Amino acid sequence: TLLKLIVGLDHPTSGQIKVGERVVTEPSLDCGIIFQEARLYPWLTVWKNVEFGITRKLGAAERRELIQQHIDLVGLHGFENALPKQLSGGMQQRVSIARALVNRPDVLLLDEPFGALDALTRINMQREVLRIWEAEKKTMILVTHDIDEAIYLSDRIVVLSSRPGRVHDIINVDLPRPRERSGEEFIRIRTKIHEYFFQNAIGGS
């Protein structure tokens, strides 16, 4: 629901959502979104899947340059002509990231984008997202149930309660990067969030 509101697919019952100075009332190119599954077109190559994300009118040369730039950005140079079935799960998600970024959105929304990946690929993709964030400097909003992932990636964590969904806490993560998951402050933040979810589960809310 939160991501639908931000992207303009749903409307708040009160208040406003703004991206920059624009009040969000409908979907726009300001926001790109990455889902839990890559959702690529199986009959299209990597190049064509990324190209499919372009909705702006561009000249042919600029279009080619933009596509190649984003394929290179996600580390898939040399795989331009590969089909999704020829790629690993992590590589498929890289294609979806390139497709979401190719329109140059101001905000990138990530809806549990690594939930379907194995543990090692998930960690590698978290590092990849940080690398892309450092290169692109986009605002990224990540929805995740993985506490370590939230601490590792985020500058700020918003902890939501369930039914009804409310903001329980906002935690600033003032840790230098790259972050050590075994570090004292990392563990302290993890414990704090764990305690909330444990209390929430015991309370039945």
Report each predicted region and the residues it spans:
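Helix-to-loop junction immediately C-terminal to a conserved catalytic motif
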Residues: 7
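Conserved ABC transporter NBD signature motif
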Residues: 15-27, 63
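Short helical segment in ABC ATPase nucleotide-binding domains corresponding to the A-loop/adjacent helical element
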Residues: 47-55, 64, 68, 172
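Conserved ABC ATPase "signature" region
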Residues: 58-79, 131
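Conserved signature/switch motifs of ABC ATPase nucleotide-binding domains
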Residues: 82-85, 103
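Hydrophobic anchor residue at the start of the ABC signature
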Residues: 97
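Catalytic Walker B motif of ABC-type/P-loop ATPase nucleotide-binding domains
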Residues: 108-111
